[in-house]
């Protein structure tokens, strides 16, 4: 359950070799979706709304729209503005929301503490500082957000809408990419044979793509960048050939005047066709969402030096070819492959299919990542997360989501069988995410960057107007495919809101029904409580007080372990928590009670490894707390009040371990080994873990620096660990109180309970052994 030891922080100063290497690697991860858009943009634009004429006003107008859309949205908005709004190197919708949570104290997580604000990444980010002076409007806006819970919920729902549309894009992008790539076979065979080849081939490729997700991409990931690089070189070379061979004057269409002529001639039909032009910027959001895997400079270099010019040349080449071929539409749909020289069509078809698979892989991986972030922030049910690589940070696989995406992707592919309707659906999902980013960015500009409100207004009006124009053109196609992302987003949003609402109600019930520390301290006198050998971990969502499940447990079984730990594993609104800040440890009651509280903090992008090192880290953190408590004479007060212990920040085993030392069992069995050898470094420990899993023993070092009383407490801690660790968890069944409204009964009794029963519980998330786990059932009337 420890964060993976990958390097997730972007270096402040990188060598040019590192930057160029990252720029090259980003081609396969970030730009796969954006690079394959030439496959279907013209085909979707000229589907029905407008027609290609001999005056070339339509094709030149479309090219002008494509050029300025790519220039203004991916280049100006994302490369030069949005990429700067990173959350300690991380990007995406939740990165913006996390920034707002910290700078405006707008937090959807119920178990937040003041101690969380002392985290290094909480206090520092690369875009601004909370110590900078705020304008009067910014201070007023911040105060309004902090005071009004309704506005906070609206902000959360806005972020969730963007997230749901990203998930919808994870369904639609593989479908339209693979289907458009395979459609190239129509130029090489008769229509009778083509209709029996195109759809089955696309479905087989999609099934294979999703079936291979379980194995991870690290084995073939090194091929992604070369495939996209080859594809970009291919389409740019074909574009240059078509420009010089068919129409060298096509560059004139880059003038905005052709957009005016296009709309003047086509009027409402031209406006409706913008839904197809919109597809030229699909995948732009990936530049920001995948920022955590690369760096700002590397992503900017890759886009400005290679991706942007290649795409412009490709679109200009297609327009140049179509400007000299006005009867193609009567024979074939206007698509990418008609502009490819006939001798190159089969090789280009193969490269296009490979590029489509790479682009689809990127959006699928991104969907897994954003669902994990939602789950960490309490906005998505707990799901099984499989780490497919021990070396590459963030390579995860979620089985349930993978198969849901595959079924939905096959359904829309088989149901539509048409690039136009697939494009309408994909376009609406893409532009909705961009609108959400624009809205959140306007708040970030004021609250986090501390810029003038005029700058925020200019940003949201300029880019919001462009995106609203495309959004309206996509929304008008509701019955022609655009209903799909809306339906998908509604279903996922309903599940997310239901889970978040149920989680909040459960936490509120725990807070209202927690028992006082006085009750816990008086147990041995009133009920004759027995203390048994071993270490007991009471899993709770509370950061203070004693949970109701423990009182319920002790009332029915009056005994608990000689060392008792109230364990809270929670997420905080930062991307990563450093190992030295992972644990908050405190004491409950007098020393002789041996009762502790441990709060384990993870960021929303931290990777939890499913292994048994968590127990060792927990024992180490408690031992370090005991040692430092004695050394600093800051002994925890023998609290008899409601609010118990003072918490101390303690790191993992790799950062501190002077209180106790760990030994492998093979070392202890050797009589020649001294009893107080130095602690192993993290790397050797990791190498030996596979051979001696769960065979680590802790020993108190023989040193005069440790006082007798402290040594005794440390020895009892190690003896309790050797006696066995028991996990005591609550299994709550939630029911709405009698007299609750219909919506609340539907949300709690049906929606939340259905999600809870069909997703992973706390025992699965902690990877606790079945034989050592005790679940305490309770009914929560909320």
Swiss-Prot record:
Residue ranges, compositional bias (Basic and acidic residues): 664-675
Keywords: Cell membrane, Ion transport, Membrane, Potassium, Potassium transport, Transmembrane, Transmembrane helix, Transport
Cysteine pairings via disulfide bonds: none
Sequence intervals crossing the membrane: 19-39, 62-82, 154-174, 196-216, 220-240, 271-291, 297-317, 348-368, 396-416, 422-442, 443-463, 475-495
Topology, Cytoplasmic side: 1-18, 83-153, 217-219, 292-296, 369-395, 496-782
Family listed: Belongs to the HAK/KUP transporter (TC 2.A.72.3) family.
Protein name: Potassium transporter 6
Source organism of this protein record: Arabidopsis thaliana
